[in-house]
Structure formats: C-alpha cells, structure tokens
C-alpha cells in the first residue's frame, strides 16, 4: 500500500485554527496546540453568552421600565399588572424604548395602567 503524506491536510487544518485565533494574546495566536484550545474555549463562551445575552437584555429592559415607572409613582410589578388588566400588549423591549425616548407616551401608559388597577 502506498504511503500517504498528510502535510497538506495538517497544514490546512493548522491554518484554519490559527486564522480563527488571530488577535489573541501571545502563544494563543501563534502556537497551534495552544491556539486550538483557545479557539475551543472561545466557542464555548460564545455559545453560553448567546443565551446569556437574551437574559441580560431582558434584565436591562426591566430595570429601565422600573426606573421610569417609579418616577411616575408606580412599581414595575404593579405597572405590568395594570397593563395586562388594561389589555395593553406591548413587550418589555418596546416599553423600555418608550421609557427612554418618549416620556410623554410612557406617562400615558402609566396612567392607563393605574386606571386599570
């Protein structure tokens, strides 16, 4: 059986990993063995953080809505409860946006929530 030399394949694989590790500090961007581990770990962090990003944005929206609602004399939970009772179906992302950029509209929503309670 003929001897198979794998230099081309190994070189391509190493190049791919080192390209993915470009910009990493020190050996993590230069040494294949270290770079491979760094790329694997980076992938794990990316996978985890794609899920965490959704939670963190929701937390941010809730904090913003709570702050704006309290300026109008209502807690977050009572505000959301009032909106549900008034059958206002605006999600937290849009509510947070309104709270930051359109204070008048948010005040109107708070009044609507208060009247529904």
Swiss-Prot record:
Which SUPFAM superfamilies does the annotation name?
Answer: Ribosomal protein L20 (SSF74731)
Q: Which residues cross the membrane?
A: none
What HAMAP family does this protein's entry cite?
Ribosomal_bL20
- Gene Ontology CC annotation, any one: ribosome
Which PANTHER family does the record cross-reference, listed alphabetically? 39S RIBOSOMAL PROTEIN L20
Q: Which residues form a coiled coil?
A: none
Return the NCBIfam families for the record. Answer: rplT_bact
Q: What does this protein do?
A: Binds directly to 23S ribosomal RNA and is necessary for the in vitro assembly process of the 50S ribosomal subunit. It is not involved in the protein synthesizing functions of that subunit.
Instruction: Say which domain of life the source belongs to.
Output: Bacteria
Tell whether Membrane is among the UniProt keywords.
no
**What is the designated name of this protein?**
Large ribosomal subunit protein bL20
Family, per the entry? Belongs to the bacterial ribosomal protein bL20 family.
Concerning Pfam families, the annotation shows: Ribosomal_L20 (PF00453)
- Where does this protein come from, organism-wise? Pasteurella multocida (strain Pm70)
């Amino acid at each position: 059986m003929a001897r198979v030399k794998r230099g081309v394949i190994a070189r391509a694989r190493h190049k791919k990993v080192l390209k993915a590790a470009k910009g990493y500090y020190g050996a993590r961007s230069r040494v294949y063995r270290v770079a491979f581990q760094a790329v694997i770990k980076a992938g794990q962090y990316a996978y985890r953080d794609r899920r965490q990003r959704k939670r963190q944005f929701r937390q941010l929206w809730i904090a913003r809505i709570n702050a704006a609602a309290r300026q109008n004399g209502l807690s977050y939970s009572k505000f959301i409860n009032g909106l549900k009772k008034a059958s206002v179906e605006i999600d937290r992302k849009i509510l947070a946006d309104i709270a930051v950029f359109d204070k008048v509209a948010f005040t109107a929503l708070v009044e609507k929530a208060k009247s529904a309670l």
